[in-house]
Design a protein with these regions (language model features):
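Conserved alpha/beta-hydrolase "nucleophile elbow" surrounding the catalytic nucleophile
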Residues: 18-23
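Hydrophobic, aromatic-rich cap/lid helix
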Residues: 66-93, 109
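Short beta-strand/loop motif that positions the catalytic acidic residue
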Residues: 97-98, 104-106
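Catalytic histidine neighborhood in serine/cysteine hydrolases
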Residues: 117, 121-138
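Active-site loop/oxyanion-hole signature of alpha/beta-hydrolase fold enzymes
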Residues: 1-17, 149
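Conserved alpha/beta-hydrolase "acid-adjacent" motif
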Residues: 111-116
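Catalytic active-site module of serine/aspartate enzymes centered on a nucleophile-bearing elbow/loop
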Residues: 134-160
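Flexible "cap/lid" loop of the alpha/beta hydrolase fold
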Residues: 24-32, 37-67
């Protein structure tokens, strides 16, 4: 709800970019408010959430100390609640409705999301897929230079 409220306060259309769970938020927002979204970038984002992944993730989160979450966008409790709220999401039948320009990015070694990246590219009308070499799921940490170049080209309209 806070994300929707925040985006709603912005005048005009917005550029959304999300990685992993953030990509799920961006995807969901784009589907619910297509008139507000100018462009969409999804990095390592699943189009449907594998329930087993969230079960394992939530088990791990329970045992992690609060200090692990200090540099994240959400504290431990909110991260856990966000994950639980997303565990039944499946955008398979809806992504075809996304018409804004979109860039799908996936690390070459991100086996968990490669199939989804290809699915999104095939089912979104104006999407392009870019694979970043020598990179797993955390593209922004593992290869920030290549990610930055892709984003710069996409947002500046100089071609992908």
């Amino acid at each position: 709800a806070a994300f929707i409220e925040y985006c709603g306060r912005i005048d005009g259309r917005i550029h959304l970019c999300g990685l992993s769970l953030g990509g799920i938020l961006a995807l969901n927002y784009t589907l619910d408010f297509p008139e507000k979204v100018k462009t969409l970038v999804l990095i390592g984002t699943p189009h449907k959430v594998p329930k087993i992944m969230f079960r394992i993730q939530n088990m791990i989160f329970r045992f992690l100390p609060e200090s692990v979450f200090q540099n994240m966008a959400f504290n431990k409790r909110d991260t856990f609640l966000l994950g639980n709220s997303m565990k039944n999401l499946d955008f398979s039948d809806r992504v075809k409705d996304i018409t804004c320009p979109a860039l799908i990015i996936c690390g070459k070694k991100d086996r968990a999301n490669m199939k989804s990246a290809r699915y999104l590219r095939q089912n979104m009308k104006n999407a392009k897929l870019k694979i970043i070499q020598n990179t797993g799921h955390v593209v922004n940490e593992e290869n920030p230079q290549d990610l930055g170049r892709l984003l710069d080209k996409f947002y500046s309209g100089t071609g992908i």
